[in-house]
């Protein structure tokens, strides 16, 4: 079966990379805006946490991925090549993933949402309320749409074997 027959992409179009990263950067930006209400040190900590997560993904996952050195839906295959040496592709689909593994990724938007709720309890303002709602929608729906319709559905690594795809597979039988 060829990539075209499976619907898999060898390299993703730049438009998909832009949309996928736009969702992430909006989450990061809105999260930083909310946390700024608590002080600049919270924003710095938040940004360092995000950078740590990004380097963790690129250093531990992207290096073994089919898209290492290629344009994946998030562009990280190209970026990881700059910072890290090629890993072992056969190792990628041998990895396992559970819900604990993705908690840090959820914390990127849940911490600012909780901080925003705390601000709203202290004093309700429409701007903070709006940011919390938008962040909630981007964090859950935005990520689900990007991964479900733009990224994972057309991913060659998913076809080869991906622990995240296995975790989120709603058709699996137990």
What are these regions (language model features)?
Residues 6-18, 33-34, 98-103, 123-124:
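Short, amphipathic, aromatic/basic-enriched membrane-interface segments that mark the entry/exit
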Residues 28-40:
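Short, hydrophobic transmembrane alpha-helix segments
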Residues 1-28, 174:
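Cytosolic-side membrane-entry/anchor segment at the start of a transmembrane helix
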Residues 66-69, 76, 156-159, 163-166:
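Cys/His-coordinated zinc-binding microdomains
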Residues 74-100:
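Short membrane-interface loop/juxtamembrane segments of multi-pass integral membrane proteins
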Residues 121-164:
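Alpha-helical transmembrane segments and their immediate juxtamembrane interface regions
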Residues 37-70, 138-147:
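Hydrophobic alpha-helical membrane-embedded segments
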Residues 21-28, 95-117:
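Core segments of transmembrane alpha-helices
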């Amino acid at each position: 079966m060829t990539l075209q027959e499976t619907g898999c992409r060898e390299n993703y179009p730049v438009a998909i990379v832009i949309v996928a990263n736009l969702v992430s950067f909006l989450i990061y930006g809105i999260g930083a805006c909310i946390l700024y209400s608590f002080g600049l040190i919270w924003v710095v900590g938040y940004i360092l946490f995000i950078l740590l997560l990004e380097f963790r993904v690129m250093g531990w996952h992207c290096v073994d991925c089919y898209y290492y050195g290629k344009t994946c839906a998030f562009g990280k295959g190209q970026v990881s090549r700059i910072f890290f040496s090629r890993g072992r592709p056969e190792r990628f689909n041998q990895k396992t993933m559970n819900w604990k593994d993705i908690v840090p990724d959820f914390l990127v938007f849940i911490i600012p949402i909780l901080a925003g709720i705390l601000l709203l309890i202290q004093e309700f303002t429409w701007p903070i309320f709006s940011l919390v709602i938008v962040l909630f929608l981007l964090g859950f729906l935005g990520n689900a749409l990007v991964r479900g319709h733009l990224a994972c559905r057309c991913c060659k690594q998913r076809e080869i074997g991906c622990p995240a795809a296995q975790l989120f597979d709603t058709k699996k039988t137990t």
